[in-house]
UniProtKB/Swiss-Prot annotation:
Lineage: Bacteria, Pseudomonadati, Pseudomonadota, Alphaproteobacteria, Rickettsiales
Comp. bias regions, Basic and acidic residues: 612-627
Bias-annotated ranges (Polar residues): 602-611
Name of the protein: Chaperone protein DnaK
Name of the coding gene: dnaK
One matching Pfam family: HSP70
Source organism of this protein record: Rickettsia felis (strain ATCC VR-1525 / URRWXCal2)
PROSITE patterns, sorted: HSP70_1 (PS00297), HSP70_2 (PS00329), HSP70_3 (PS01036)
Family statement drawn from the similarity comment of this UniProt entry: Belongs to the heat shock protein 70 family.
Length: 627
């Protein structure tokens, strides 16, 4: 087995590392840099990757693609994609399958393809350093990436000619690098604010075991959003001073973006900077120049709400893990944005401790991926990584209820089965609809996919036993199967949503679940109460058909009256009334049971006496004296 490389496929920059002996090492690229800009450009039928692509972006904005990670696995109609359309100079287009793709040099590319070009650069960088062909890799993704996004990332690896041995969460990879070859036991938080995404994970590290307790995040929050705030500020200031709107000028936008990113970085180490962009545009009076003094205080005011948005996921992650901020013994900062003093200040304020700055925030994720590659390659031993799935997974059941099979923050890989049945008599097929989210009703969650299980033998409802199995692999990718236990017929599917789950949808699911918890609970309770009552009505009617002639008219009348009352209650939306009538019918049914049991016992006693009488035999006998 050859070397397994670790790749941090970032929104803004990417990085590749490999195990050298017992230590992970970041590999320099052809330009002598340890990180590579995640930028692709198409110019004169030539494809440029990394720094060369970034250098020509100002003169070729329409054909220069950056931050494509924010589009990967997303549908074109996703609100976040719509938001990005107004911020980037290149075209985002709708693919035939509904996904968001990009257009450059008169060609359409999927985000997986663009990502593959970056991965190829990482692959070549490693091959040049190692002097051998590289075919296997561990690739990192944001912890809050959904199934479609993980699948699309894995596809990117395949396009790049890499066998992706493992998809690993970025905060987990950072924790691996932080805790590698450290013997102490600690509970840590990894705060990862990168170029396009934010993640926070809570982990317990002890004797080589890295156990993720919870994770949370926002897959559309990062340095790109900070840059956009600065860019919009520059546009507003220039428009106020000159009356010219630069937002419709792709060339000016690209220059403004570069200036915004540069100013943001400078303000991490200085209190003020000058933004000078000569000849930014021109009008009838001649060329116009942009010259603005920009302070750290102004920047902090512009992005204060973005920084604050990272705190709620931290709070939720701690809650899910069952910890308080004071339980965290170390806060590890990951991602270039954590160099910003205001971000560090917010982290310190929330966790009540100075964050750990002993790791390189741009390289630590790739180092962790390389360590995981070493584990899979058996170069590294005595390390056990236990990661989690970020959102609950389940299916839609009778009444539209979302029945969870695997809860969020469940350790992966994980496999869970549950037996369901049919809702109608002689039902020969069932549709399994797979959802992801935190709401109690399936329709309020995200449909990941669906499939049919056909050929179920005719039987009364509730009789067939259909076993549904959810299997999440170590990459966080979902596999679902349904099997009719009587016929042995089985249907399996790897869930591949056409457009993936949007970040806004995921966040909204959790927020809505909290805001609408009472409403969801009542609705779920009503449906479950109705389902139970409906089943009781069905079984009671069946009992009356089969044993009604054995009941007295008084007993039968009482049951029929209770049955009619429950049927009437089922027409309403009153859960308490349905429960009351269900209890009444249950009590009436118990009296039937007592009567039937008594009759059956008497019948058995009578039969036993008859059998005993039949066994009595007359016999002659003779006394024999003992001699």
């Amino acid at each position: 087995m050859g070397k397994v490389i670790g790749i941090d496929l970032g929104t803004t920059n990417s990085c590749v590392a490999v195990m050298e002996g017992k230590e992970p090492k970041v590999i320099d690229n052809a330009e002598g840099e340890r990180t590579t800009p995640s930028i692709i450009a198409f110019a004169n039928s030539e494809r440029l990757v990394g720094q060369p692509a970034k250098r020509q972006a100002v003169t070729n904005p329409r054909n220069t693609i950056y931050a494509v990670k924010r589009l990967i696995g997303r549908n074109f109609t996703d609100p976040m994609v719509r938001k990005d359309q107004g911020l980037v100079p290149y075209n985002i287009v709708k693919a035939d399958n509904g996904d968001a793709w990009v257009e450059a040099d008169n060609n359409k590319y999927s985000p997986s393809q663009i990502s593959a070009f970056i991965l190829q650069k990482m692959k070549e960088t490693a091959e040049n350093y190692l002097g051998e062909k590289v075919t296997q890799a561990v690739i990192t993704v944001p912890a809050y990436f959904n199934d479609a996004q993980r699948q699309a990332t894995k596809d990117a690896g395949k396009i790049a000619g890499l066998e992706v041995l493992r998809i690993i969460n970025e905060p987990t990879a950072a924790a691996l690098a932080y805790g590698f070859e450290k013997s102490s036991s600690k509970t840590i938080a990894v705060y990862d604010l990168g170029g396009g995404t934010f993640d926070v994970s809570i982990l317990e590290i002890s004797d080589g075991v890295f156990e993720v307790k919870s994770t949370n995040g926002d897959t559309f929050l990062g340095g790109e959003d900070f840059d956009t705030r600065i860019l919009n500020h520059l546009i507003d200031v220039f428009k106020k001073d000159s009356g010219i709107d630069l937002s419709k000028d792709p060339l000016a936008l690209q220059r403004l973006k570069e200036a915004a990113e540069k100013a943001k970085k400078e303000l991490s180490s200085t209190s003020a900077t000058d933004i000078n962009l000569p000849y930014i545009t021109a009008d009838s009076t001649g060329p116009k120049h942009l010259n603005i003094k920009f302070t750290r205080a102004e920047l902090e005011k512009l992005v204060d709400d973005l920084i604050e948005k990272t705190i709620e996921p931290c709070r939720q992650a701690l809650k899910d893990a069952g910890f308080k901020p004071t339980d965290i013994q170390e806060v590890v900062l990951v991602g270039g944005m954590t160099r910003m003093p205001k971000v560090q200040e917010a982290v310190k304020k929330f966790f009540g401790r100075e964050p750990h700055k002993g790791v390189n925030p741009d390289e630590v994720v790739a180092l962790g991926a390389a360590i995981q590659g070493g584990v899979l390659n058996k170069e590294v031993t005595d390390i056990l990584l236990l990661d989690v799935t970020p959102l609950s997974l389940g299916i839609e059941t009778l009444g539209g209820v979302f029945t969870r099979l695997i809860d969020r923050n469940t350790t992966i890989p994980s496999k869970k089965s549950q037996v369901f049945s049919t809702a109608d008599d002689n039902q020969h097929a069932v549709t399994i609809r797979v959802f992801q989210g935190e709401r109690e009703m399936a329709k309020d969650n995200k449909l990941l996919g669906q499939f049919n299980l056909e050929g179920i033998p005719p039987a009364p409802r509730g009789v067939p036993q259909i076993e549904v199995t959810f299997d999440i692999d170590a990459n966080g990718i979902v596999h679902v199967s349904a099997k009719d236990k009587a016929s042995g017929k089985e249907q399996k599917v790897t869930i591949q949503a056409s457009g993936g789950l949007s970040d806004s949808e995921i966040e909204q699911m959790v927020k809505d679940a909290e805001h609408n918890a009472d409403e969801d609970k009542k609705r779920k309770e009503l449906i479950e109460t109705k389902n139970a009552a409906d089943s009781l009505v069905y079984s009671t009617e069946k009992t009356l058909r089969e044993y009604g002639d054995k009941l007295s008219s008084e007993e039968k009348g009482a049951v029929e009256e209770a049955l009619a009352s429950l049927k009437s209650a089922l027409e309403s939306e009153d859960a308490s009334l349905i429960k009351e009538k269900t209890n009444n019918l249950t009590a009436a049914n118990m009296k039937i049971g007592e009567t039937m049991y008594k009759a059956q016992t008497e019948n058995q006693h009578s039969e036993a006496n008859t059998v005993n009488d039949e066994k009595v035999v007359d016999a002659d006998f003779q006394d024999v004296d003992k001699k």
